[in-house]
């Protein structure tokens, strides 16, 4: 496998996960996009905002390509207090989705322009680990996005029962009801 085909494969996997994350917002109210669904406040719009922040950082700033748009929560360091993980009342979902799409475009330019072995520096990592490569950061971003796409699938399912992308391909409502009953019986055997 050549470096360029590996880069193309990583880019494809990244885009599939990006698309999956945004698909979890479809058809939801502003409230449902924003409301915390777990004890750690996981929410769909916050996942999108976080991923936009991470892409601008890892696939932009760390390779000498600063974000073309301001990220106030990075500039004022409130990101360190979780400000990238939720949407303020005055931040529109359209703004956050567009911020994520802008991060994609910026990252896609990095992917097109940089070799996987291009040097990179992550200033917020411990000094002994700061020097790395673009390829390492691209793999990290693919993993980060896939990780949060899974969170988005589960969060969406908690909101309205809509599962991941292949949920309906696996079975209809009755199939899922029977499946959940089987899984519950197996768990109940260990009460």
Give names to the regions the model predicted:
Residues 1-6:
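Short, contiguous pre-domain boundary segments
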Residues 67-108:
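Helix-adjacent hinge/juxtasegments
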Residues 109-116:
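Glycine-rich, acidic and aromatic/proline-enriched surface loops and short helix-turn segments
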Residues 7, 11-25, 30-81, 122-191:
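Short, contiguous alpha-helical
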């Amino acid at each position: 496998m050549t470096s360029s085909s590996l880069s193309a494969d990583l880019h494809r996997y990244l885009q599939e996960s990006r698309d999956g994350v945004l698909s979890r917002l479809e058809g939801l109210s502003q409230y449902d996009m924003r409301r915390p669904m777990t004890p750690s406040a996981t929410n769909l719009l916050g996942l999108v905002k976080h991923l936009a922040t991470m892409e601008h950082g890892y696939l932009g700033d760390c390779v000498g390509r600063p974000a073309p748009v301001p990220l106030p929560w990075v500039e004022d360091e409130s990101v360190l207090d979780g400000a990238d993980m939720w949407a303020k009342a005055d931040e529109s979902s359209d703004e956050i989705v567009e911020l994520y799409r802008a991060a994609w475009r910026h990252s896609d330019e990095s992917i097109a322009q940089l070799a996987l072995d291009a040097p990179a520096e992550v200033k917020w990592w411990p000094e002994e680990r700061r020097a790395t490569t673009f390829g390492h950061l691209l793999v990290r971003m693919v993993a980060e996005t896939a990780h949060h796409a899974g969170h988005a699938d589960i969060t969406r399912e908690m909101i309205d029962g809509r599962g991941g992308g292949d949920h309906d391909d696996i079975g209809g409502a009755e199939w899922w009801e029977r499946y959940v009953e089987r899984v519950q019986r197996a768990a109940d055997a260990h009460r």
